[in-house]
Amino acid sequence: MAVKPITIKEIARMAHVSCATVSRTLNGDPGVSQELRTEIFRLCRQHGYRKNLVARRLSAARSGLIGCILSDMNNPLFAEFALALEEAAHRRGLQVMFCQGQAEAPDFSKKLEFLIGHRVDGVILTSSSRQVPEAIAPYTDRIPIVIQGTLPPEEGGIPAVSLDCAEAGRQAARYLYGLGHRRAVFLGLRENNCAMLQRYQGFQAAAEELGMSVRTLVNPERTSTAAVGYQLGRRFFFDNLTETAVFAGSDNVALGFLAAAREFCVSVPDEISLLGFDNISHAAMHHVRLTTFDPRNRTLAEQSLERLLQCLEPGGGLGEMPLIPPIFVERATCAPPGLREA
């Protein structure tokens, strides 16, 4: 027997407020207190409440325009995803409107309002921030939203297309162990980023099983940049840390670490191995040749768009999708332990 969907009246009853207050909260009314807003969002997530979008879809003709919010346009990873998404949309006769925004930023709601104001049919958000569920909650009854990224495990009801980040972390640990490394660093952890956190957890778990020790150097910023990698790299070498391998949270961080290694006259990979994640175009250049993981941007773009188009159909876009495994790309920055091991 099918379970009857929860209604806005039931959410209002549990929150001890009126239906109008719940509606105003979900629509982002600034007059609702933060305490009440948090409680209503919690109840909606807990009970799977989501307004029926069918009426909106049937009453408004589709524009053929898709919105996409990129977390960081300065990051080549997102630029490459944007290109792949635009190509996928073009093949379907669709256009894409891009803007930049981070779920934890104060102006994030303005980005969604901007896209809605331009009558996009739906939105793809590239983000793995823990703040995503709360940031999009006021809008999920107004427009379909698909997340290209990793969400907290408890948020399984949000349409998402995600990488198998934990398996990538495990694979990284096994690879470095196979080369002979027993002491490693996870460089640039952002604990608010669910994708990176899962990579770290997979790396840490596999390393523990293999008997490897792992040191963690945390990224204090909201984005993963070469500047962060450079500063963490300088700290690593200045403190004379003895780990023989580094798994960087992103290729940008890895490239910054590589610059610091050269400044300290440390050879990669002869003295220390370096493994990245993202396979940005710069990682393949002849003077870098970074060993890394490819997140398969074309596949992510295709599946994100397909999921969004499914969400535009009555009853579509429900259920979880299989995780997409990244592809390991071996180049020239990892080798068996060298001088540092000696």
Residue ranges and their predicted role:
Residues 89-100, 204-227:
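Short beta-strand elements in bilobed, periplasmic/extracellular small-molecule ligand-binding domains
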Residues 103, 125-170, 212, 252, ...:
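Flexible loop/hinge segments that line or gate small-molecule binding clefts
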Residues 119-127, 185-187, 219, 240-250, ...:
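Periplasmic-binding protein-like
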Residues 160-186, 201-205, 226-236, 254, ...:
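Hydrophobic alpha-helical segments within soluble ligand-binding/sensing domains
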Residues 170-212, 320-334:
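An alpha-beta-alpha
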